[in-house]
Amino acid sequence: DEMGRTQQGNNNAYCQDNEIGWLDWRGLVEVPAVGGARARPALRMSGAEGAVMPDPTLVEFTARLIALRRRYPQLRRTTWLTGAATAIGGRDVVWLNRQGEEMNRRQWEEWGRYAFSFLLGAAAPGENDLMVMMNGEASDWATSLPPGRWQVLLDTVQADGRPDEAMAVLQSRIVLKGRSLRLLE
């Protein structure tokens, strides 16, 4: 889970009144703001002598994901994404192929498609589109970005998800490392 707790393989730990189900809340710390959201508390675990504690970077990464979800309505939609027009004129989602072009039916049906991206249309006036890029392949993937200026909000190459400062703002091309995900605005 978000704190790296395996619960010793027990998926019914809710009924365990022992170390398997307990959380040590003394490790609560404030995680810096992300993408315009205000700072939020997060649990940095510490515990009993000899206890296996989660990686604090995982907790910070999860807090970053939560902050991004709170900040961007596109990441918490309550309806299916269909590609339909939105009330403000764009589309709710546009699926892109490896070259950064809209996917066609044939491409959807190709086996072995492990690198793609999609645009999540702005949910309200004044908001920006988001782009999610996923590379499930072992090799790096170079692709074109849609027109405009893009800022990297999340990069899973970094353990805490923070984008590398040198890659924070992009204009036309991007290289995505193998087995990684990036979120752009």
For every predicted segment, state its role:
Residues 1-131, 136-150:
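Loop/helix patches that line or flank the sugar-binding groove of alpha-linked glycan CAZymes
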Residues 27, 120-122, 154, 178, ...:
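Pocket-edge structural micro-motifs
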Residues 31-32, 158-160, 181-182:
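A short acidic, often aromatic-flanked loop/helix-cap motif at beta-alpha or helix-coil junctions
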Residues 147-159:
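Solvent-exposed beta-hairpin/edge-strand motifs
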Residues 166-185:
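C-terminal beta-strand-rich structural cap/linker in extracellular carbohydrate-active enzymes
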